[in-house]
Curated annotation (Swiss-Prot):
Pfam families: DHHA1 (PF02272), tRNA-synt_2c (PF01411), tRNA_SAD (PF07973). One of its GO terms (biological process) is alanyl-tRNA aminoacylation. The keyword Magnesium does not apply. Binds 1 zinc ion per subunit. Signal peptide: none annotated. Consists of three domains; the N-terminal catalytic domain, the editing domain and the C-terminal C-Ala domain. The editing domain removes incorrectly charged amino acids, while the C-Ala domain, along with tRNA(Ala), serves as a bridge to cooperatively bring together the editing and aminoacylation centers thus stimulating deacylation of misacylated tRNAs. This is Alanine--tRNA ligase. One of its GO terms (molecular function) is alanine-tRNA ligase activity. It catalyses: tRNA(Ala) + L-alanine + ATP = L-alanyl-tRNA(Ala) + AMP + diphosphate. Its cofactor is Zn(2+). The gene is alaS. Belongs to the class-II aminoacyl-tRNA synthetase family. GO terms for cellular component: cytosol. Gene3D superfamilies: 2.40.30.130, 3.10.310.40, 3.30.54.20, 6.10.250.550, Bira Bifunctional Protein, Domain 2, Threonyl-trna Synthetase, Chain A, domain 2.
Length: 876
């Protein structure tokens, strides 16, 4: 008897309720951005509990159960190609912290799978660690699994460890058998065509020391994981995870946009649809948890996934932005379990739209270059060329590798790394963000040094010890004058970039030592000071004096507090429901992105500016307090989305004006800001607006620049500043009149040229066909000429004209008479097809249509094709 079909949501809820009934506390999924500084993303259900398993933290409850969202990209090349590989997945888990152990964990698992989910026992097989006789006996003697259905596997598959030392233990797994009729002879649980692992039980019972010796733990723990998508495949009786109700609605939405029928498509099209369905789930959750696309760290993972989605969309014929539209389906599917998706919907769509548009701007040119490289390569794409695709066109290296592999080629990785290193050497600017090389080095150092202590809220100068030194991202013991370095101090007054505020600048000094610090980033708990040694030798262990640039700090403080005032003013004047979508607090300017469905009016901007300057003039003191997060929320403090908060939070309060959770630096009194001036307001994505502004000394600098521009224009136009507006209006009217006259002259020229072309029409049956190229004729004139020619040729006239009015651009126009249309030819469809030859497209009405292209060298080919196709169509 088959197990009853359950929806993905029902499977999740059934699992969690089952373990609640077994005394487990249901806990919410943790963020994809882990607390563990050594891990880039949450990759397993146990990760939020790792400090408990490692003995670093005491568990609040003895038993817990969760549905944890996870992301893994180590098998990304298999996504869509196998039945069960994903980047995003949900891991259902039950955990015991020193409470029950092996016997109970196995019994719970078997009861859930066979009695609650009603999976027939004959469909199941289990594995145990080859030396775990206890687990083997429990499965055989207490659960009743036939010995032939229990397989012993080695440490590679069935022994878990957190690292070379520390807690570890054997695993046991439950497998679903798609073909039990094949019997038990030669049973191979690693045969993916027959078995799928659905439940993994980890028994943490040992501690491994540096010598590799195992000793029993005083408190034994249980960590389990059931893949929701895998169990859905089993219970829903579908051939793969992608066709479950957790993912397939997304695939169907993509197929609808691409005008594809999933069931009847080729395997390659299905792979692309599956990749998009999988990746859209991943990127939606990443953005919801505060990740933004970049070339580094988590941002790089997000960018890589979005760009794979866009490329696979193009492979199946989607030639327009579509990710935000599909995100709506993904959000609707998952919002009940993850309500932050709905709360962050506007930000998700905005980030997807922004990143997709950025990639599309260079994708076509990059694809053209890549096509040329693929055609020229015999077995390998040069590393330098792969780097150009990465650096200039935004192609992640992995994407180039994937496309190359489809053509049976490889990429020269060593050459790519060499080109990357050469580019780093050419760049003289400080790193603006931490890169993966630095992060990897810090991860390796994490076990040897303590995280940095920040003392910069109260001190601008501090004596500190150099605990780590990196050059080009690699750990070194010493560096000398001229070297660009990354420095970790035991404590520091330098603020590290976070919450939108840029890192401090300043200097490190010592005996005969000067290091100019240009930027500070925080990663893995360390404050990383980016700079260049101007004089002397710097070594790990040195004592240095760390001093921030006070002027830069004061400017950042003014801009940061001004940003808080700006959000308060927006809520007061525009809409109380406005929420922050992003920000930048630099030394010379500030930027604030916010969720709002409409533009802020000029009058509202004036009111906002006036209100902020009034608060500045009123000299409100700022109050900084550290309090429990629950207390802060109860007081109405606004949280910045994407920031991670602990049990205790820092609150910046401008009494009666603004209260926000914030780790940044701020003025002690609003009067220190001086002045505030809005520079611009614009939309950056659907539902997201951006205000750019200046505060403090930057206002005077901005006004001085404006004044210089006005003076220059006054001199050029021989007009007083107050007369400039009228003078510019008059010039615009004059230009408009001249352009109108020029258009008329071009039309007259086109008509004259068209009159001369009438005699060149050729008869095709009872029709008159004219296909020609005109030089120096723009789109409007070309259309006028085509219409006139068709009228002269009569109802049976068919005209196609082409021109290249600008370098690299093509314009094509078709004009068909009623008799031509009656033969089934439509100008819009016809000219759109011809334009593809020139790398473009277009369309219009059946009698008159226009198209464009980007490859002028193909215009003669397009004109010839138009004539051939017209002859064939009319003659038939």
């Amino acid at each position: 008897m088959a197990a009853p079909a359950l929806s993905g949501d029902q499977i999740r809820e059934t699992f969690l309720k089952f373990f609640e009934g077994k005394g487990h506390r249901r806990l919410p999924s943790a963020s994809l951005i882990p607390e563990d500084p050594t891990v880039l993303l949450t990759i397993a259900g146990m990760l939020p509990f790792k400090p408990i398993f490692l003995g670093q933290q005491v568990a609040e409850v003895p038993r817990a159960t969760t549905s944890q969202k996870c992301i893994r990209t180590n098998d990304i090349e298999n996504v869509g190609r196998t039945a069960r590989h994903h980047t995003f997945f949900e891991m259902l888990g039950n955990f015991s912290f020193g409470d029950y152990f092996k016997k109970e964990a196995i019994a719970f698992a078997w009861e859930l799978v066979t009695e609650v989910f009603q999976v027939p026992a004959e469909r199941l097989a289990v594995s145990v660690f080859e030396e775990d006789d206890e687990a083997f006996a429990i499965w055989r003697d207490q659960i009743g699994v036939p010995e032939a259905r229990i397989q012993r596997l080695g440490a590679k598959d069935n022994f878990w460890a957190s690292g070379p030392t520390g807690p570890c233990g054997p695993c046991s797994e439950i497998y679903y058998d798609f073909h039990p009729e094949l019997g038990n002879d030669g049973l191979d649980l690693e045969d993916d065509s027959r078995f799928i692992e659905v439940y993994n039980l980890v028994f943490m019972q040992y501690n491994r020391d540096a010598a590799g010796n195992l000793t029993a733990l005083e408190k034994q723990n249980i960590d389990t994981g059931m893949g929701l998508e895998r169990m859905a495949q089993v219970l829903q009786g579908v051939p793969n995870n992608y066709e479950t109700d957790l993912i397939f609605p997304i695939i169907q939405a993509v197929a609808a946009i691409a005008q594809r029928d999933y069931a009847s498509e080729s395997e390659s099209v299905k792979v692309s649809l599956k990749v998009i369905g999988d990746h859209l789930r991943a990127v939606t959750h990443l953005i919801a948890d505060g990740v933004t696309a970049s070339n580094l760290g988590r941002g790089y993972v997000l960018r890589r996934l979005i760009r794979r989605v866009v490329r696979h969309g193009r492979l199946i014929g989607i030639d327009r932005p579509f990710t935000a539209e599909i995100a709506e389906t993904a959000i609707a599917l998952m919002a009940a379990q993850y309500p932050n998706l709905r709360e962050r919907e506007a930000a998700i769509k905005a980030e997807l739209t922004r990143e997709e548009q950025r990639f599309l701007e260079t994708l076509e040119r990059g694809e053209k270059l890549l096509a040329e490289l693929l055609a020229a390569a015999t077995d390998q794409i040069r590393g330098e060329d792969a780097f150009v695709l990465y650096d200039t066109y935004g192609f992640p290296l992995e994407l180039t590798q994937e496309i190359a592999e489809e053509k049976g080629l490889t990429v020269d990785l060593a050459g790519f790394e060499a080109a990357m290193a050469a580019q780093r050497q050419r760049s003289q600017a400080a790193h603006e963000t931490i890169d993966l090389t630095v992060q990897g080095s810090l991860d390796r150092l994490a076990e040897q040094i303590h995280p940095s202590e920040f003392v910069g809220y109260g001190d601008a100068v501090a004596t500190a010890k150099v605990t780590a030194l990196l050059r080009e991202g690699q750990s070194v013991e010493a560096a000398e004058a001229g070297d660009r370095v990354q420095i970790v101090l035991d404590h520091t007054p330098f603020y590290a970039e976070s919450g939108g505020q840029v890192g401090d600048r300043g200097v490190l000094t010592g005996e005969s030592l000067i290091v100019r610090i240009e930027d500070v980033q925080k990663e893995s708990g360390f404050f990383v000071h980016y700079g260049q040694i101007e004089r002397g030798l710097l070594q790990v262990g040195d004592s240095v004096t760390a001093q921030i640039d006070r002027a830069c700090r004061r400017r950042a403080q003014a801009n940061h507090t001004a940003t808080h005032l700006l959000q308060a003013a927006l809520k007061l004047i525009v809409d109380e429901g406005i929420s922050q979508a992003g920000s930048l607090v630099a030394f010379d300017r500030l930027r604030f992105d916010f969720n709002c469905p409409r533009a802020v009016t000029p009058e509202e901007l004036r009111q906002i500016e006036d209100q902020i300057n009034q608060w500045i003039a009123e000299a409100h003191g700022t109050v900084v307090e550290v309090m429990p997060i629950a207390t802060a929320k109860a007081k109405g403090a606004v949280a910045m989305f994407g920031e991670k908060y602990g049990a205790e939070v820092r609150v910046i309060d401008v009494p009666g004006v603004s209260m926000e959770l914030c780790g940044g630096t701020h003025v002690a009194n609003t009067a220190e800001i001086g002045l505030f001036k809005i520079i611009s307001e614009a939309g950056v994505a659907s539902g997201v607006r951006r205000i750019e502004a200046v505060a403090g000394p930057a206002v005077l600098e901005y006004l001085n620049v404006r004044d210089a521009v006005v003076r220059d224009l006054s001199d050029r136009f021989k007009a007083k500043p107050e007369e400039l507006s009228d003078r510019v209006t008059a010039l615009q009217e004059e230009l408009k009149a001249n352009q109108k006259q020029l258009t008329a002259l071009k039309a007259e020229l086109a008509i004259a040229k068209s009159d001369a072309l009438v005699s060149q029409a050729i008869p095709v049956g009872d029709a008159q066909v004219l296909v020609e190229t005109l030089t120096g004729v723009d789109a409007a004139a070309l259309q006028t000429a085509a219409e006139r020619l068709q009228q002269k040729l009569g109802d049976a006239g068919a005209v196609v004209l082409g021109s290249s009015p600008e370098e690299g651009k093509v314009t094509l126009v078709a004009a068909f008479g009623p008799a031509i249309i009656a033969k089934g030819l439509k100008a819009g469809q016809f000219i759109g097809g011809i334009a593809k030859i020139c790398g473009g497209g277009g369309g219009g009405r059946p009698n008159l249509a226009q198209a464009g292209g980007r490859d002028a060298s193909k215009l003669p080919e397009a004109i010839a094709a138009a004539l051939d196709q017209l002859k064939t169509a009319i003659a038939s």
